[in-house]
Amino acid sequence: MQSSVNEFLTPRHIDVQVVSPTRAKITLEPLERGFGHTLGNALRRILLSSMPGCAVVEAEIDGVLHEYSAIEGVQEDVIEILLNLKGIAIKLHGRDEVTLSLVKKGAGAVTAADIQLDHDVEIVNGDHLIANLAANGSLNMKLKVARGRGYEPADARQSDEDESRSIGRLQLDATFSPVRRVAYVVENARVEQRTNLDKLVIDLETNGTLDPEEAIRRAATILQQQLAAFVDLKGDSEPVVVEQEDEIDPILLRPVDDLELTVRSANCLKAENIYYIGDLIQRTEVELLKTPNLGKKSLTEIKDVLASRGLSLGMRLDNWPPASLKKDDKATA
């Protein structure tokens, strides 16, 4: 058995092509046939859903009580401002949480560079637009920045303390992952007389807070650590009874409208009685392609949006739908 393991090829050539400061193409070859997709898919999922980073998770704006407000002298409404805050690429050095201030008056654009920073806080995209002010406009806000991993909806951070939280502290859904886009292709590779080998090419783009090469290195480390337990696997003398968790991930109970799909894709899903994210992930690609007016472009959009939240099509949920999810809720969704 040991000799057959040693016959497996291991990658001998790694090439990193820097496309821009935030984008790189990493080529790994040669790989045994099939290992290109095995490694590429695993690394892609980790890069999209499991990379740690920092994001704005809460905003408190003077004169604003809720997100549906408008501010005099500010071109954008509060919802637009909150969406713009999500696009700030920020790094914390040595801290997991910090509160920052932004004060701006008079006509002009308000950008991420206007945020008052501590010495251990860094903003990569200082030219990122937050709002536009008129001559009589002013913007005074406090921003809470936290460290996290992957994607975290605002309601996942709710606790008993939130009930006593002052009115006007607006919670944001946070995308902590510094990875903005990742795709991979598997090409043919050749070693001597063997022509059926794989070459893995990963195209990776980040928000600038993490170098693409470092991102792929961290993803590989996470995968290695998760698989390490299998190397010295030993069976227990007595079977361990694992209690089944009835609790369902809250994100699966959210409506598909929260995925912010195009109108065409959203309407196609609703026509097939797919109202919740939990309904969607249980469908396969083949099933969705049979949906009238839903083509490959819409399917790709759906897969990318799910992947950004650590989900994919074709997943199985044993306890779906939960008892708390009533059928009449779907009728009014």
Curated annotation (Swiss-Prot):
The keyword Transferase applies. Keywords: DNA-directed RNA polymerase, Nucleotidyltransferase, Transcription, Transferase. GO terms for molecular function: DNA binding; DNA-directed RNA polymerase activity; protein dimerization activity. The keyword Chloroplast does not apply. Residues 248-333 are annotated as: Alpha C-terminal domain (alpha-CTD). It comes from the Bacteria. It is an enzyme of class 2 (transferase). It catalyses: RNA(n) + a ribonucleoside 5'-triphosphate = RNA(n+1) + diphosphate. GO terms for biological process: DNA-templated transcription. Gene3D superfamilies: 5' to 3' exonuclease, C-terminal subdomain, DNA-directed RNA polymerase, insert domain, RNA polymerase, RBP11-like subunit. InterPro entries: DNA-dir_RNA_pol_insert, DNA-dir_RNA_pol_RpoA/D/Rpb3, DNA-dir_RpoA, RBP11-like, RNAP_asu_C, RNApol_insert_sf. Its EC number is 2.7.7.6. Residues 1-234 are annotated as: Alpha N-terminal domain (alpha-NTD). One of its GO terms (cellular component) is cytoplasm. Pfam families: RNA_pol_A_bac, RNA_pol_A_CTD, RNA_pol_L. Belongs to the RNA polymerase alpha chain family. DNA-dependent RNA polymerase catalyzes the transcription of DNA into RNA using the four ribonucleoside triphosphates as substrates. Homodimer. The RNAP catalytic core consists of 2 alpha, 1 beta, 1 beta' and 1 omega subunit. When a sigma factor is associated with the core the holoenzyme is formed, which can initiate transcription. The N-terminal domain is essential for RNAP assembly and basal transcription, whereas the C-terminal domain is involved in interaction with transcriptional regulators and with upstream promoter elements. This is DNA-directed RNA polymerase subunit alpha. The lineage of its organism: Bacteria, Pseudomonadati, Pseudomonadota, Gammaproteobacteria, Pseudomonadales.
